[in-house]
Amino acid sequence: MLNIIATRSILFYQRYISPFKGSSCRFYPSCSHYSLQSLEKYGFLKGLLYSVRRIMKCHPFHPGGYDPVK
């Protein structure tokens, strides 16, 4: 149930909020796509942990780059 809520929240963000922000993620795949993939692969708790860790790295002082879900 929590996994579904988290996934739908991310999809809402991707569809309605992200287009107005422009491309600002330093990583590929983007942080929202990474979060969806980690939730799908690892489930809610571990996927949320990976997502938060990734979002914490997404700032101007981190070089970014290719960082897939492992």
UniProtKB/Swiss-Prot annotation:
Pfam families the UniProt entry points to: YidD
Chief location bin: membrane
Recorded superkingdom: Bacteria
Cell inner membrane found in the keyword field: yes
Subcellular location(s) of the protein: Cell inner membrane
Gene Ontology CC entries for this record: plasma membrane
Membrane topology: Peripheral membrane protein
Signal peptide (residue range): none
Record keywords, A-Z: Cell inner membrane, Cell membrane, Membrane
InterPro entries: Membr_insert_effic_factor_YidD
Family of the protein in this entry: Belongs to the UPF0161 family.
Role summary: Could be involved in insertion of integral membrane proteins into the membrane.
Protein name: Putative membrane protein insertion efficiency factor
